[in-house]
Amino acid sequence: MEVKRTVLVHESDNVLTAFSDFSAGEIVSVQLDTGDIEVELLDDIAFGHKIAVRSIEAGSPIVKYGCTIGKATQEIKIGQWVHTHNVGDDYQEN
């Protein structure tokens, strides 16, 4: 039996990292500082990609490793794939 895993790196993160390929509709169990929750995946998620573990409003930070890694360009629901199609970077050109 294949064991599929996700990792929440820091308590303040609003995204998980997928350590397996997942299909939409699968359920992942997540340990949060507020208690364990189950998240139903709304999208197919490839190994190494991010999954929203909390609702993220458009313009809000994407937090991984306890640090902001970008901002949501649209609302992201719990269980959605978080990637370049719904995240913008915070880098500014000089």
Predicted regions and their residues:
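N-terminal small-residue-enriched
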Residues: 2-94
